[in-house]
Amino acid sequence: MQWCDNDYFQKVGEDFVQWYYNQFDNTNRMELVNLYAEGATLTWEGTLFSGREAIAGKLTGMPFQQIKHIITDHDIQPTLDKSILVMVFGQLKADNDLPLAFHQVFMLKPLNGNWVCTNDVFRLGVHNIPVEAQ
């Protein structure tokens, strides 16, 4: 199979997205930590978390009881070093809050026959537009 075979990297990326958000929404988020490489980095709303332990603390320490992600779309592409870049767009609803738009980007790399996440960037789609002085 050719690395740039569209079906291959699309399937890997789509399977990752489906599994990640299913785990995040429906089960113990501690299971997500197994997807991250030892030295992985997560940036959550501008705050950096380095390493699996720090990422586990962030993912399991969220203040909500329930959450549901609705994936609007995603883009998946291979990189020159045979990794996979995944960009996800959607909405999330936590507890009784109104739905919010979100964007999340994952870098997936092959390691010992499995795919691991080395980089994860999450941002809510909230715009902080300054009000002009009158």
Q: Where do the PLM segments sit?
A:
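Eukaryotic basic, amphipathic alpha-helical target segments in cytosolic regions
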Residues: 21-28, 40, 44, 63-67, ...
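A solvent-exposed, acidic/Ser-Thr-rich amphipathic alpha-helical stretch
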Residues: 29-30, 38-82
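Intrinsically disordered, low-complexity regions enriched in proline, serine, glycine
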Residues: 33-34, 44-45, 53, 67-71, ...
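Short beta-strand edge/turn micro-motifs at domain boundaries
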Residues: 87, 95-134
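Hydrophobic pocket/interface hotspot
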Residues: 20, 31-32, 55, 108
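Eukaryotic intrinsically disordered and solvent-exposed regulatory patches
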Residues: 5, 18, 28-29, 72-75, ...
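Short, low-complexity N-terminal intrinsically disordered segments enriched in polar/charged residues
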Residues: 1-22, 26
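A short hydrophobic beta-strand element
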Residues: 80-92
